[in-house]
């Protein structure tokens, strides 16, 4: 086996440069919500957004934290005589303000889309050079979130400085409106966005577009994993490809500014249940936004129970906001049909002194995997409290909603109330501070100094744990 080790330095670049917690007071935890693009692309309408919001609410997902309803590309019909954007009246007959009001009246937040280019990616009017009037359009329509893409940028890229100023123009324009608007950059990680994004935005994409494949290589996503400075980000990037590119970037993200690994593919395509669990777990662990990409009106029971796993979401919404680190990576001989095979261990600190740990199996067969306190607390010195204490192990995927119950909720034969965690009534921060057992998983054992944590991990699957100091 060929080993790769990625241990983050004790003093990260974020610490050196003193990145502020949030440039606009938003994004104190990674955003959660739904975006239409992965499933519907340009097939958008007022009815789709409002029906989807109602369904998210009925399924209890809004109260789990999925508050942003994000309208992606293809909503515009052009500009009016004053240069302001105009919504397509066939798709949105009552206008964007009506959509915003409906969502706000039902305790959602409204997201819209544009591009830092002459056109959007689908060829509609972009905002390059028109940042102030477009920002005012979004504010006038009571928008709470802007996804800002990178197509048709007139060649204004190639150095961090050029890209920074192109995206800063919209950041400044949004702030000038006086309306708090979450600013989500979608420039595919071009020009090292993770270095400069936190000063002007709340999240930033760090790779090409995701596809519903766990490991499959694709020539349209030409850079391999760990090529974090990809000159051509592309699209159709697999889950493992994006995850590996994100591995060294956690030190540049945190409260107020997050690495965005792209929308979730849980419930999209033909991923296995183990692949969907691994995908959701790792996005949660590295503090990526949790944006549902599926059609919530046609979710499988197993996918719904993944989206509603409170103990995993609590890792993502942890107030400390520190992305986990990949501690080790090995290539393995049992490769899958695409010639891919690797195993990894990730670890990261949590706000209340706990630690999150993942053993990820990218091989083609189930296998025993293990780790130790020395690996889990890789920055701790010998004799430290972390390495000389006993830790209780909690399985974060235990107590998952069973398929029968999930199906009953999806078929509206049973209410989600009382079954799912309600973060509207009690935030994840408050639930964690009060030791709400729903957020910690199920205790399965303990790990003492010099002992080994052993488990069997399914192919393309994960073992996902919270470690808590033993009483």
UniProtKB/Swiss-Prot annotation:
GO terms for cellular component: extracellular region. The active site is at residues 149, 209. GO terms for molecular function: alpha-galactosidase activity. It is found in: Secreted. Residues 1-18 form the signal peptide. GO terms for biological process: melibiose catabolic process. Glycans are attached at residues 105, 175, 270, 370, 403, 422, 435, 454. Pfam families: Melibiase_2, Melibiase_C. Disulfide bonds join 42-74, 121-151, 221-237, 223-230. Its EC number is 3.2.1.22. Substrate binds at residues 72-73, 147, 205, 251. It catalyses: Hydrolysis of terminal, non-reducing alpha-D-galactose residues in alpha-D-galactosides, including galactose oligosaccharides, galactomannans and galactolipids. The keyword Disulfide bond applies. Its main location: secreted. CDD domains: GH27. The keyword Signal applies. PROSITE patterns: ALPHA_GALACTOSIDASE (PS00512). Keywords: Disulfide bond, Glycoprotein, Glycosidase, Hydrolase, Secreted, Signal. PANTHER family: ALPHA-GALACTOSIDASE MEL1 (PTHR11452:SF75), ALPHA-GALACTOSIDASE/ALPHA-N-ACETYLGALACTOSAMINIDASE (PTHR11452). Homotetramer. Belongs to the glycosyl hydrolase 27 family. This is Alpha-galactosidase 6.
């Amino acid at each position: 086996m060929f080993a790769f080790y990625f241990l983050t330095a004790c003093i990260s670049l974020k610490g050196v440069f003193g990145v502020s917690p949030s440039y606009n007071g938003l994004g104190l935890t990674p955003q959660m919500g739904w975006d239409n693009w992965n499933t519907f692309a340009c097939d958008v309408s007022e009815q789709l957004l409002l029906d989807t919001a109602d369904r998210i609410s009925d399924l209890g997902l809004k109260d789990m934290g999925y508050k942003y309803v994000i309208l992606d590309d293809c909503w515009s019909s052009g500009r009016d005589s004053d240069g302001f954007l105009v919504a397509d009246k066939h798709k949105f007959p009552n206008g964007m303000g009506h959509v915003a009001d409906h969502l706000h009246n039902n305790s959602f937040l409204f997201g819209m889309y544009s591009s830092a280019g002459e056109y959007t990616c689908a060829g509609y009017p972009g905002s390059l050079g028109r940042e102030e009037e477009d920002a005012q359009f979004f504010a006038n329509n009571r928008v709470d979130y802007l996804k800002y893409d990178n197509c048709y940028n007139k060649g204004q890229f190639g150095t961090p400085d050029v890209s920074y100023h192109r995206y800063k123009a919209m950041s400044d324009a949004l702030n000038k409106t006086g309306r708090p608007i979450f600013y989500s950059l979608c420039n595919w990680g071009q020009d090292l966005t993770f270095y400069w994004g936190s000063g002007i935005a709340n999240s930033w994409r760090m790779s090409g577009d995701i596809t519903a494949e766990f490991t499959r290589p694709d020539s349209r996503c030409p850079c391999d994993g760990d090529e974090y400075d990809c000159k051509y980000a592309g699209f159709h990037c697999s889950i493992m490809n994006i995850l590996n590119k994100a591995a060294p970037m956690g030190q540049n993200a945190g409260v107020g500014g997050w690495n965005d690994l792209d929308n979730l593919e849980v419930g999209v395509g033909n991923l296995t249940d183990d692949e969907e669990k691994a995908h959701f777990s790792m996005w949660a662990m590295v503090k990526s936004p949790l944006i549902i990409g599926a059609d919530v009106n046609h979710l499988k029971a197993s996918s719904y129970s993944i989206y509603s796993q409170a103990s995993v979401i609590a890792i993502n919404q942890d107030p400390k906001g520190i992305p986990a680190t990949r501690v080790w990576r090995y290539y393995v001989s049992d490769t899958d049909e695409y010639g891919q095979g690797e195993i990894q261990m990730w670890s990261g600190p949590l706000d209340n002194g706990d630690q999150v740990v993942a053993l990820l199996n990218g091989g083609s067969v189930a296998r025993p995997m293990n780790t130790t306190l020395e690996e889990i607390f890789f920055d701790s010195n010998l004799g430290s409290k972390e390495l000389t204490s006993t830790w209780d192990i909690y399985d974060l995927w235990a107590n998952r909603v069973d398929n029968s119950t999930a199906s009953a909720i999806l078929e509206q034969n049973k209410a989600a109330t009382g079954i799912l965690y309600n973060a509207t009534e009690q935030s994840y921060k408050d639930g964690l501070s009060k030791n709400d057992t729903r957020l910690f998983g199920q205790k399965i054992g303990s790990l003492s100094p010099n002992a080994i944590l052993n488990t069997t991990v399914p192919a393309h699957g994960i073992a996902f744990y919270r470690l808590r100091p033993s009483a």
